[in-house]
């Protein structure tokens, strides 16, 4: 499935590719795994997305995936450092420090991918998505 949204005159194309069932958080947390592609003006980034929906992702799920991706980037951007991030999201009590580091790097990657893709303000589009699609 693919969908295109228009934000302030810019077309944002969202597509996904089903990757199968995954257990990224342990065996009892089975999720469908997708690779989501965001294309703006011919430039493209991709990210991993896990959800309960089955293949293919419908338009509303693709928009939700973009919102989650952008929210991760904002979480990174708003934190002073990895330890501030950990406290904000309750990871300061998290015993697996490697997992914390992986989550931090994933959020940093989301921010870096978005800012390398386009000059659309990450906060403004995230708020717009939330208001427009009731996320």
List each model region and its residues:
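Generic alpha-helical hydrophobic packing signal
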Residues: 10-12, 40-44, 133
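Short intrinsically disordered terminal tails
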Residues: 1-4, 127-135
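Acidic, low-complexity, intrinsically disordered interaction modules
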Residues: 18-127
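Negatively charged, low-complexity tracts enriched in Asp/Glu with abundant Ser/Thr
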Residues: 1-12, 20
């Amino acid at each position: 499935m693919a969908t295109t949204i228009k934000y302030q005159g810019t077309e944002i194309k969202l597509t996904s590719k089903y990757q199968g069932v995954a257990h990224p958080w342990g065996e009892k947390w089975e999720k469908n795994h997708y690779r989501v592609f965001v294309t703006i003006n011919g430039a493209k980034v991709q990210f991993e997305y896990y959800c309960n929906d089955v293949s293919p992702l419908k338009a509303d799920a693709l928009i939700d995936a973009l919102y989650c991706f952008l929210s991760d980037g904002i979480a990174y951007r708003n934190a002073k450092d990895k330890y501030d991030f950990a406290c904000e999201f309750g990871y300061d009590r998290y015993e697996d420090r490697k997992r914390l580091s992986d989550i931090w790097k994933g959020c940093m990657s989301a921010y870096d991918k978005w800012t390398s893709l386009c000059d659309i303000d990450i906060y403004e589009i995230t708020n717009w998505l939330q208001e427009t699609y009731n996320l």
